[in-house]
Amino acid sequence: MGYHAGMSYDLIVIGGGPAGYVGAIRAAQLGKSVVCVERDRVGGTCLNWGCIPTKALLKNGEVYENIAKRAAEFGIQAEGVSVDWPAVIARSRAISDRLSGGIAFLFKKNKIDHVAGEARILAPGQVEVTDAEGATTLLEGKNILIATGARTREVPVFPFNGKTIIGSKEALTLPTLPSSMIVIGSGAIGTELSYVYHCFGTKVTLVEALPRILPNEDDDVCTAMERAFKKRGITCMAGAKVESLQDHGDSVTATITAKNGKTQEVTADVCLVAVGVVPVVPQAEGLQLTERGFIQVDDHYRTNLPGVYAAGDCIGGIMLAHTASYEAEQAVEGMFVEGHTPQKPTLVPGCTYCHPQVASVGKRERELKEAGVAYKVGKFPFQAIGRAVASGETEGFVKLLFGAEHGELLGAHIMGEGATELIATPELGMSAELTDADLNAMIYAHPTMAEAIHEAVLAADGRAIHA
């Protein structure tokens, strides 16, 4: 289409991440004129500094670990294997570049204009964009979708210096491979990067203030994951508090109070602080925010400003890339599809990409207990699954939670090889309101990791075949 002065759009999208670019494309598919404003690279944090580059590094790490540490297990002799760290980082960045370029292509294909710069909402229907040189452009449109995402939360007492105390973005482009690393926070980001650096030989100490690592997961997963990490040589300190960080220029010392009350000092080349994110909110006079600083929206993703909507991490809730995309699609269809009632995400899978992988959807067992829900548990280990044994990937299990009376699937928790792919089956089952009887009626291909799902269904009634 091509932007020109005085042009008015059906939709101005602020932010080109998983919410912004998906919302822009959906609006274009509906025949609307769209412009997307992005101050950095299209694709957002996920594609450029999160989901995608971490998965690239993870694959690099797994390849190295399998060759250097497990080759003999498969009858292969490998000697003199080493890491070319600059090449590792370069591959990760090249993948992000490729996919960001793919989104730029999709913008052209769908006739979406792209304006680079920082956006400021002057009034409903008016957005001012300031580019890197300070020049301003005025955009006008009938609707505005704010999809500005979130950024790494920086703890005031642990200020980033870009060298020894860093956030996740810096962890993806470290110039040299550190020999040791302290990671504060064991959510998905902290856990994944702990595993990645461990693969390459970095001595990792993972510190979590809550009683378990991966604290948002089911208790069985938390316990098993901590055991798996410790077996690999990753030091896990759950229920611990980092009292202070002392920067030495080329290293950093953390003073940590363990859960037993004892204080110890840990020194490492670098400390990664991964304790969550905070919303990024554009300048907009009168825009209503929540107490935590997120943009306040109603059930239709509308803000308090007329014609201004918001979706994705900037509105809080379940802050995942796939949730953001869903919310943006719902918001856009609510704007332009007559009779459409936008939906809020309710059934959202969560995935952690380390080894073994972790994936979950629905309720955790402790939630059912606290709510007084009558339930039954089906749990089955991968070590009894033929494909897992043949692949040398026997760690982990499938755990399914069913309603005691009707057998409805209430939650699914998978830890093991391919967990992030396997979770789609129970998610679909929950979405379709399938029962344990329905899931048992399916035929599961053999030999596959998915057979553990079938065995877990049977195990809920004490009928597992290979137990």
Whereabouts are the PLM-identified features?
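Beta1/beta-strand and adjacent pyrophosphate-binding region of the FAD-binding site
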Residues: 6-19, 177-187
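Glycine-rich flavin
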Residues: 2-9, 25-32, 37-177, 205, ...
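Short hydrophobic core segments
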Residues: 12-14, 119, 138-149, 183-184, ...
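Residues forming the Rossmann-fold NAD(P)(H) cofactor-binding site
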Residues: 21, 191
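Gly/Ala-rich phosphate-binding loop of Rossmann-like dinucleotide-binding domains
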Residues: 24, 28, 194, 198-199
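Flexible, glycine-rich terminal cap/loop adjacent to redox cofactors
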Residues: 14-19, 25-40, 52, 56-63, ...
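FAD-site-proximal beta/loop scaffold in flavoenzymes
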Residues: 161-177, 265-337
